[in-house]
From Swiss-Prot:
Signal peptide as annotated in the record: none
Organism from which the protein derives: Ectopseudomonas mendocina (strain ymp) (Pseudomonas mendocina)
Enzymatic class: transferase
Taxon lineage: Bacteria, Pseudomonadati, Pseudomonadota, Gammaproteobacteria, Pseudomonadales
Protein name: Tetraacyldisaccharide 4'-kinase
The protein's role, per its UniProt record: Transfers the gamma-phosphate of ATP to the 4'-position of a tetraacyldisaccharide 1-phosphate intermediate (termed DS-1-P) to form tetraacyldisaccharide 1,4'-bis-phosphate (lipid IVA).
Keywords of the record: ATP-binding, Kinase, Lipid A biosynthesis, Lipid biosynthesis, Lipid metabolism, Nucleotide-binding, Transferase
Family: Belongs to the LpxK family.
Record GO terms (molecular function): ATP binding; tetraacyldisaccharide 4'-kinase activity
Pfam families: LpxK
Tagged with keyword Phosphoprotein: no
E.C. number(s) listed in UniProt: 2.7.1.130
Protein backbone atom coordinates (compact mmCIF):
# COMPACT_ATOMS: atom_id res chain seq x y z
CA UNK A 1 0.00 0.00 0.00
CA UNK A 2 1.37 3.41 -1.00
CA UNK A 3 1.77 6.29 1.43
CA UNK A 4 -1.15 8.06 -0.27
CA UNK A 5 -3.35 4.98 0.16
CA UNK A 6 -2.40 4.69 3.83
CA UNK A 7 -3.27 8.34 4.40
CA UNK A 8 -6.60 7.90 2.62
CA UNK A 9 -7.40 4.88 4.78
CA UNK A 10 -6.54 6.85 7.91
CA UNK A 11 -8.86 9.69 6.89
CA UNK A 12 -11.81 7.38 6.41
CA UNK A 13 -11.14 4.75 9.09
CA UNK A 14 -9.37 6.85 11.69
CA UNK A 15 -5.83 6.88 13.09
CA UNK A 16 -4.50 8.61 16.23
CA UNK A 17 -1.44 9.95 14.38
CA UNK A 18 -3.68 12.32 12.41
CA UNK A 19 -3.86 14.51 15.52
CA UNK A 20 -0.30 15.59 14.73
CA UNK A 21 -1.55 17.21 11.52
CA UNK A 22 -4.18 19.41 13.14
CA UNK A 23 -1.99 22.55 13.31
CA UNK A 24 -1.53 22.28 9.54
CA UNK A 25 -5.26 21.69 9.16
CA UNK A 26 -5.94 24.91 11.07
CA UNK A 27 -3.70 26.84 8.65
CA UNK A 28 -5.35 25.20 5.65
CA UNK A 29 -8.84 26.07 6.92
CA UNK A 30 -7.81 29.71 7.41
CA UNK A 31 -6.61 29.90 3.80
CA UNK A 32 -9.68 28.30 2.19
CA UNK A 33 -12.13 30.20 4.37
CA UNK A 34 -10.32 33.43 3.51
CA UNK A 35 -10.64 32.70 -0.21
CA UNK A 36 -14.34 31.98 0.23
CA UNK A 37 -14.91 35.16 2.24
CA UNK A 38 -13.19 37.31 -0.40
CA UNK A 39 -15.34 35.71 -3.10
CA UNK A 40 -18.57 36.38 -1.19
CA UNK A 41 -17.47 39.98 -0.61
CA UNK A 42 -16.81 40.44 -4.33
CA UNK A 43 -13.13 41.12 -3.75
CA UNK A 44 -10.41 40.20 -6.19
CA UNK A 45 -10.46 39.35 -9.88
CA UNK A 46 -13.75 37.45 -10.28
CA UNK A 47 -15.04 36.73 -13.78
CA UNK A 48 -18.78 36.44 -14.42
CA UNK A 49 -19.57 34.82 -17.75
CA UNK A 50 -22.38 36.15 -19.95
CA UNK A 51 -24.06 32.72 -19.74
CA UNK A 52 -24.93 30.64 -16.67
CA UNK A 53 -22.14 28.56 -15.11
CA UNK A 54 -22.91 25.30 -13.32
CA UNK A 55 -20.05 24.00 -11.17
CA UNK A 56 -19.82 20.27 -10.44
CA UNK A 57 -17.31 19.54 -7.71
CA UNK A 58 -16.25 17.81 -4.52
CA UNK A 59 -15.38 18.85 -1.02
CA UNK A 60 -13.62 15.52 -0.46
CA UNK A 61 -10.43 14.09 -1.93
CA UNK A 62 -11.00 11.00 -4.07
CA UNK A 63 -13.48 9.80 -6.63
CA UNK A 64 -17.20 10.49 -6.33
CA UNK A 65 -18.54 9.68 -9.82
CA UNK A 66 -18.20 13.23 -11.09
CA UNK A 67 -17.39 12.43 -14.72
CA UNK A 68 -20.45 10.17 -15.28
CA UNK A 69 -22.66 12.86 -13.75
CA UNK A 70 -21.19 15.50 -16.06
CA UNK A 71 -21.95 13.21 -19.01
CA UNK A 72 -25.54 12.95 -17.76
CA UNK A 73 -25.80 16.74 -17.44
CA UNK A 74 -24.47 17.27 -20.96
CA UNK A 75 -27.00 14.93 -22.51
CA UNK A 76 -29.88 16.16 -20.36
CA UNK A 77 -29.24 19.80 -21.21
CA UNK A 78 -28.86 18.99 -24.89
CA UNK A 79 -32.21 17.21 -24.81
CA UNK A 80 -33.70 20.52 -23.64
CA UNK A 81 -32.22 22.22 -26.70
CA UNK A 82 -29.33 23.90 -24.89
CA UNK A 83 -25.85 24.41 -26.32
CA UNK A 84 -23.48 23.21 -23.62
CA UNK A 85 -19.74 23.69 -23.15
CA UNK A 86 -17.38 22.31 -20.51
CA UNK A 87 -14.28 23.75 -18.86
CA UNK A 88 -11.85 21.67 -16.84
CA UNK A 89 -8.50 22.05 -15.17
CA UNK A 90 -7.18 19.17 -17.27
CA UNK A 91 -5.35 17.43 -14.44
CA UNK A 92 -2.19 15.74 -15.72
CA UNK A 93 -2.54 17.19 -19.23
CA UNK A 94 0.49 18.57 -21.07
CA UNK A 95 -0.95 20.68 -23.90
CA UNK A 96 1.28 22.87 -26.10
CA UNK A 97 -0.43 25.99 -24.76
CA UNK A 98 -3.20 27.16 -22.47
CA UNK A 99 -6.11 27.45 -22.73
CA UNK A 100 -6.37 24.30 -24.87
CA UNK A 101 -9.36 23.03 -26.85
CA UNK A 102 -9.69 19.27 -26.43
CA UNK A 103 -10.42 17.23 -29.58
CA UNK A 104 -11.42 13.58 -29.78
CA UNK A 105 -8.28 12.58 -31.72
CA UNK A 106 -5.83 13.95 -29.14
CA UNK A 107 -3.93 11.82 -26.64
CA UNK A 108 -4.79 11.56 -22.97
CA UNK A 109 -1.28 12.84 -22.17
CA UNK A 110 -2.03 16.02 -24.10
CA UNK A 111 -5.67 16.54 -23.14
CA UNK A 112 -6.06 14.79 -19.78
CA UNK A 113 -7.93 11.53 -19.32
CA UNK A 114 -11.26 12.87 -18.05
CA UNK A 115 -11.57 15.74 -20.58
CA UNK A 116 -10.71 13.36 -23.42
CA UNK A 117 -13.29 10.84 -22.21
CA UNK A 118 -15.97 13.55 -22.10
CA UNK A 119 -15.18 14.78 -25.62
CA UNK A 120 -14.96 11.30 -27.10
CA UNK A 121 -18.27 10.30 -25.53
CA UNK A 122 -20.25 13.47 -26.32
CA UNK A 123 -18.36 15.70 -28.77
CA UNK A 124 -19.03 18.64 -26.43
CA UNK A 125 -16.90 21.79 -26.81
CA UNK A 126 -14.36 21.54 -23.99
CA UNK A 127 -11.49 23.81 -22.95
CA UNK A 128 -8.83 22.96 -20.36
CA UNK A 129 -6.90 25.47 -18.26
CA UNK A 130 -6.11 25.59 -14.54
CA UNK A 131 -7.46 29.15 -14.80
CA UNK A 132 -11.14 28.25 -15.32
CA UNK A 133 -12.07 31.88 -15.97
CA UNK A 134 -9.63 32.04 -18.88
CA UNK A 135 -10.96 28.71 -20.15
CA UNK A 136 -14.54 30.05 -20.15
CA UNK A 137 -13.53 33.20 -22.04
CA UNK A 138 -11.67 31.15 -24.65
CA UNK A 139 -14.54 28.71 -25.10
CA UNK A 140 -17.14 31.46 -25.50
CA UNK A 141 -14.89 33.15 -28.08
CA UNK A 142 -15.13 29.99 -30.20
CA UNK A 143 -18.65 28.72 -29.51
CA UNK A 144 -22.12 30.26 -29.06
CA UNK A 145 -23.19 28.54 -25.85
CA UNK A 146 -26.19 28.68 -23.53
CA UNK A 147 -24.56 27.05 -20.50
CA UNK A 148 -21.09 26.24 -19.15
CA UNK A 149 -20.40 23.19 -17.00
CA UNK A 150 -17.30 23.62 -14.85
CA UNK A 151 -15.68 20.29 -14.04
CA UNK A 152 -14.32 20.19 -10.49
CA UNK A 153 -14.12 23.94 -9.99
CA UNK A 154 -15.87 24.31 -6.65
CA UNK A 155 -12.83 25.89 -4.98
CA UNK A 156 -11.87 28.03 -8.01
CA UNK A 157 -13.37 31.26 -6.73
CA UNK A 158 -12.07 33.43 -9.56
CA UNK A 159 -15.02 32.10 -11.58
CA UNK A 160 -18.50 33.26 -10.57
CA UNK A 161 -21.12 30.54 -10.66
CA UNK A 162 -24.90 30.31 -10.85
CA UNK A 163 -25.31 26.78 -9.50
CA UNK A 164 -23.07 24.58 -7.37
CA UNK A 165 -23.49 20.80 -7.31
CA UNK A 166 -21.38 18.79 -4.86
CA UNK A 167 -20.91 15.03 -5.07
CA UNK A 168 -20.24 12.71 -2.14
CA UNK A 169 -19.46 9.00 -2.07
CA UNK A 170 -22.25 7.50 0.07
CA UNK A 171 -20.03 4.68 1.32
CA UNK A 172 -17.20 6.95 2.43
CA UNK A 173 -19.14 10.03 3.43
CA UNK A 174 -16.94 12.83 4.77
CA UNK A 175 -14.52 10.51 6.54
CA UNK A 176 -13.33 12.04 9.81
CA UNK A 177 -14.83 15.39 8.71
CA UNK A 178 -11.48 17.16 9.00
CA UNK A 179 -9.78 19.30 6.37
CA UNK A 180 -6.50 18.55 4.64
CA UNK A 181 -4.03 17.25 5.65
CA UNK A 182 -5.70 15.83 8.79
CA UNK A 183 -8.71 14.63 6.82
CA UNK A 184 -10.13 14.34 3.29
CA UNK A 185 -12.03 17.65 3.13
CA UNK A 186 -11.02 20.38 0.70
CA UNK A 187 -13.36 22.76 2.53
CA UNK A 188 -15.06 22.55 5.93
CA UNK A 189 -18.17 20.36 6.10
CA UNK A 190 -20.31 23.45 6.74
CA UNK A 191 -19.74 24.39 3.09
CA UNK A 192 -22.36 21.81 2.09
CA UNK A 193 -25.08 24.02 3.56
CA UNK A 194 -24.15 26.76 1.07
CA UNK A 195 -24.26 24.80 -2.20
CA UNK A 196 -27.37 24.44 -4.34
CA UNK A 197 -27.52 20.64 -4.37
CA UNK A 198 -25.67 17.68 -2.87
CA UNK A 199 -25.69 14.35 -4.70
CA UNK A 200 -24.73 11.14 -2.94
CA UNK A 201 -23.27 8.44 -5.16
CA UNK A 202 -24.60 5.06 -4.08
CA UNK A 203 -27.26 6.30 -1.67
CA UNK A 204 -30.47 4.27 -1.72
CA UNK A 205 -32.91 7.20 -1.60
CA UNK A 206 -33.06 10.97 -1.47
CA UNK A 207 -32.76 12.48 2.00
CA UNK A 208 -32.66 15.81 3.77
CA UNK A 209 -28.89 15.81 3.13
CA UNK A 210 -29.21 15.54 -0.64
CA UNK A 211 -30.26 13.65 -3.73
CA UNK A 212 -29.27 10.07 -4.49
CA UNK A 213 -27.72 8.83 -7.69
CA UNK A 214 -26.13 5.60 -8.83
CA UNK A 215 -23.74 4.45 -11.51
CA UNK A 216 -25.47 1.93 -13.76
CA UNK A 217 -23.26 -0.43 -15.81
CA UNK A 218 -24.59 -0.45 -19.36
CA UNK A 219 -22.20 -2.30 -21.69
CA UNK A 220 -18.83 -3.91 -22.30
CA UNK A 221 -16.80 -2.08 -24.95
CA UNK A 222 -13.79 -3.62 -26.67
CA UNK A 223 -10.74 -1.34 -26.72
CA UNK A 224 -9.45 -2.63 -30.08
CA UNK A 225 -12.60 -2.99 -32.18
CA UNK A 226 -14.95 -0.62 -30.36
CA UNK A 227 -17.54 -3.41 -30.34
CA UNK A 228 -20.22 -2.78 -27.73
CA UNK A 229 -21.73 -5.86 -26.11
CA UNK A 230 -24.26 -6.51 -23.38
CA UNK A 231 -23.15 -7.36 -19.87
CA UNK A 232 -24.23 -10.96 -20.46
CA UNK A 233 -21.15 -11.37 -22.69
CA UNK A 234 -19.31 -12.28 -19.48
CA UNK A 235 -21.19 -15.14 -17.77
CA UNK A 236 -21.66 -15.29 -13.99
CA UNK A 237 -18.43 -16.32 -12.34
CA UNK A 238 -16.23 -14.94 -15.13
CA UNK A 239 -12.75 -14.14 -13.81
CA UNK A 240 -11.20 -10.92 -15.13
CA UNK A 241 -8.16 -8.80 -14.47
CA UNK A 242 -9.71 -5.56 -13.20
CA UNK A 243 -7.74 -2.32 -13.71
CA UNK A 244 -8.80 0.94 -12.07
CA UNK A 245 -6.77 4.15 -11.93
CA UNK A 246 -9.51 6.29 -10.40
CA UNK A 247 -10.08 8.12 -7.15
CA UNK A 248 -11.75 5.12 -5.50
CA UNK A 249 -10.70 1.89 -7.26
CA UNK A 250 -12.53 -0.31 -4.77
CA UNK A 251 -15.87 1.03 -5.99
CA UNK A 252 -15.07 -0.35 -9.47
CA UNK A 253 -14.08 -3.73 -8.06
CA UNK A 254 -17.27 -3.83 -5.97
CA UNK A 255 -19.31 -3.10 -9.10
CA UNK A 256 -17.77 -6.07 -10.90
CA UNK A 257 -18.51 -8.33 -7.95
CA UNK A 258 -22.11 -7.09 -7.90
CA UNK A 259 -22.35 -8.20 -11.55
CA UNK A 260 -21.37 -11.71 -10.38
CA UNK A 261 -17.92 -11.63 -11.96
CA UNK A 262 -14.68 -12.50 -10.16
CA UNK A 263 -12.27 -9.57 -10.47
CA UNK A 264 -8.56 -9.92 -9.83
CA UNK A 265 -8.02 -6.34 -8.61
CA UNK A 266 -5.19 -4.18 -9.95
CA UNK A 267 -5.59 -0.71 -8.38
CA UNK A 268 -3.52 2.17 -9.73
CA UNK A 269 -3.16 5.81 -8.72
CA UNK A 270 -5.78 8.25 -9.98
CA UNK A 271 -4.86 9.52 -13.48
CA UNK A 272 -2.16 6.83 -13.80
CA UNK A 273 -0.35 6.52 -17.12
CA UNK A 274 0.06 2.99 -18.48
CA UNK A 275 2.12 0.92 -20.86
CA UNK A 276 1.58 -2.62 -22.13
CA UNK A 277 4.11 -4.13 -19.72
CA UNK A 278 2.29 -2.74 -16.68
CA UNK A 279 -0.93 -4.44 -17.78
CA UNK A 280 0.55 -7.83 -18.62
CA UNK A 281 -0.89 -10.12 -15.96
CA UNK A 282 -0.98 -13.83 -15.22
CA UNK A 283 -2.94 -16.01 -15.55
CA UNK A 284 -4.32 -15.08 -18.99
CA UNK A 285 -7.79 -13.62 -18.47
CA UNK A 286 -9.89 -10.91 -20.12
CA UNK A 287 -8.84 -7.49 -18.88
CA UNK A 288 -11.60 -5.11 -17.77
CA UNK A 289 -10.99 -1.46 -16.91
CA UNK A 290 -12.83 1.81 -16.41
CA UNK A 291 -13.62 4.05 -19.37
CA UNK A 292 -11.31 6.67 -17.91
CA UNK A 293 -8.44 4.18 -18.08
CA UNK A 294 -9.42 3.00 -21.56
CA UNK A 295 -8.72 6.37 -23.21
CA UNK A 296 -5.06 5.91 -22.22
CA UNK A 297 -4.71 2.29 -23.33
CA UNK A 298 -6.23 1.96 -26.81
CA UNK A 299 -2.89 2.42 -28.59
CA UNK A 300 -1.45 -0.80 -27.13
CA UNK A 301 -4.58 -2.75 -26.19
CA UNK A 302 -4.92 -6.49 -26.74
CA UNK A 303 -7.94 -8.16 -28.32
CA UNK A 304 -9.47 -9.23 -24.99
CA UNK A 305 -9.29 -5.82 -23.28
CA UNK A 306 -12.62 -4.21 -22.41
CA UNK A 307 -13.97 -1.27 -20.49
CA UNK A 308 -17.19 -1.15 -18.52
CA UNK A 309 -19.43 1.67 -19.70
CA UNK A 310 -21.46 3.21 -16.86
CA UNK A 311 -24.18 5.84 -16.79
CA UNK A 312 -25.12 8.16 -13.94
CA UNK A 313 -28.77 7.68 -12.95
CA UNK A 314 -30.05 10.40 -10.61
CA UNK A 315 -33.46 10.28 -8.98
CA UNK A 316 -36.53 11.91 -10.57
CA UNK A 317 -36.57 14.48 -7.76
CA UNK A 318 -33.12 15.74 -8.76
CA UNK A 319 -34.08 15.88 -12.44
CA UNK A 320 -37.19 17.90 -11.56
CA UNK A 321 -35.10 20.29 -9.45
CA UNK A 322 -32.53 20.64 -12.23
CA UNK A 323 -35.17 21.40 -14.85
CA UNK A 324 -36.67 24.14 -12.69
CA UNK A 325 -33.25 25.70 -12.15
CA UNK A 326 -32.43 25.58 -15.87
CA UNK A 327 -35.77 27.21 -16.69
CA UNK A 328 -35.01 29.95 -14.15
CA UNK A 329 -31.50 30.58 -15.45
CA UNK A 330 -32.29 30.22 -19.16
CA UNK A 331 -35.89 31.33 -19.81
CA UNK A 332 -37.50 29.33 -22.58
CA UNK A 333 -35.28 26.30 -22.10
Amino acid sequence: MSAADRLLEAWYRGHPALALLRPLEWLYRRVVQGKRARFLAGQGDIYRAPVPVLVVGNITVGGTGKTPLILFLIEHCRARGLKVGVVSRGYGATPPSLPWRVRADQSAAQAGDEPLLIVQRTGVPLMIDPDRSRAVRALLAEEPLDLILCDDGLQHYRLARDLELVLIDAARGLGNRRCLPAGPLREPAERLAEVDAVLSNGAETDSAEGYAFRLQPSALVNLVSGERLGLEHFPPGQAVHAVAGIGNPQRFFNTLEALNWRPVPHPFADHAQYDAAQLSFEPPLPLLMTEKDAVKCRAFAAADWWYLAVDAVPTPAFVDWLDKELARLIPGS
